[in-house]
Amino acid sequence: MIAPTEPTEGNSRASVLEFDEEGYVESEDEDFDPSKPADDDKEEELSDKSDGDYQEADEEAEKYDYSHIESSEGGLVSTRNARRLQHEREQREKYEHFEMQGVSSRAGELWAQLQEESQARLHDTSSVMHAGGEAGKDRMQEEQIMIERAYWFAGEMVREKKMVLKSSAEAQEYLNSLKFKPKELVPSTMQEMDGGSKLRRPLKRPPILEQIIAGALKPKLTTLEKSKLDWATYVDKEGINEELQLFNKDGYLAKQDFLRKVDGIQNEQYKELRRQELQKNGAQGM
């Protein structure tokens, strides 16, 4: 606590304050500031400076030297940026010092062998293509006929004409569907006058019956006939005509007949062996 004293004669203007050091608490003082250093610290700091023990200037002047510190792999310790720059420089210099080496004789022989095999394959491919082209040309040179189909579709008469091979299933179906063979119309004869001049007889429209007999009018296709033609077109497109002929109904019946004959022959052979076995056993018993 601060104990005020009575003013003396020598100091009448100012009052002297005496501090009770034992009972004084600094935190209870109104002017206490915890952020400021204490007076005792200031006094110690001043005493250190005065005695020469304070070496702050020397510590600030001292600088750490990392140039002699080495990593476990050897060399100076580098930062991330230095390592990145070093890596980029190594990548750039990687191809600058690359030297082309001569190709060995073994590699040259393998390359020549591969070239020969490639040329041989190209030659074989060209030969196959040439043979296929000749076969297709021969097929095109085969006799072709024009077939015409007329049928109602969606309420409209549709007429279709196309060239097909005479040996194709579609052509055979079309020829079988024709009820009348086409006949050439006889051209109108010309008459000569006594004077030697030729006159043309005016043409008239022939009757429909004569056109049908002559084959000028094609019969309309029924739904069944159109289905047959569509099936024949599909067979020619897929190329299964020979396969169908091999596995048709007649072929199946022929196979069944052959199997029955084989079974009959096997039964006859079994009966003959059985009869011989019985005769042999009877002779031994007698």
Swiss-Prot record:
Residues 1-90 are annotated as: Disordered. InterPro entries: BCNT-C, Swc5/CFDP1/2. Coiled coil: none annotated. Keywords: Activator, Chromatin regulator, Nucleus, Transcription, Transcription regulation. It comes from the Eukaryota. The keyword Nucleus applies. GO terms for cellular component: cytosol; Swr1 complex. The keyword Nucleus applies. CDD domains: Swc5_NTD. GO terms for biological process: chromatin remodeling. Belongs to the SWC5 family. This is SWR1-complex protein 5. It comes from Eremothecium gossypii (strain ATCC 10895 / CBS 109.51 / FGSC 9923 / NRRL Y-1056) (Yeast).
